[in-house]
């Protein structure tokens, strides 16, 4: 399988896409979340002067099993997988 290149200014995903991603918390716990892309930052939000990949703000409808929606910001493109319908 060929590795996808994450190119600043050329995002792989669009607003409205259903995606999955993992987050690692400060306690070391890693959780997987499904959500919908709300905002695309084509040049990323991490490396302002030298962007390496786009980032996304993703709406998770059931944050950590609480039933509460949460907008998770600045998720790097390399951490996201599209959910096929």
Language-model features, listed with the residues they occupy:
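Hydrophobic beta-strand residues in large extracellular and virion-surface proteins
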Residues: 16-21, 35-39, 58-61, 75, ...
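Acidic surface patches and DE-rich sequence motifs
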Residues: 6-7, 25, 41, 47-48, ...
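Mixed-charge, Lys/Arg-rich low-complexity intrinsically disordered regions
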Residues: 1-18, 22-25
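Intrinsically disordered, low-complexity, charged/polar segments
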Residues: 53-85
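Short beta-strand-centered aromatic/proline hotspots
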Residues: 29-46
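Intrinsic-disorder/low-complexity loop/linker signature
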Residues: 10, 27-29, 43, 67-68
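Short linear proline/tyrosine/threonine-rich motifs used for host-factor recruitment
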Residues: 21-23, 30-34, 71
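Short, solvent-exposed secondary-structure boundary/capping segments
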Residues: 44-56
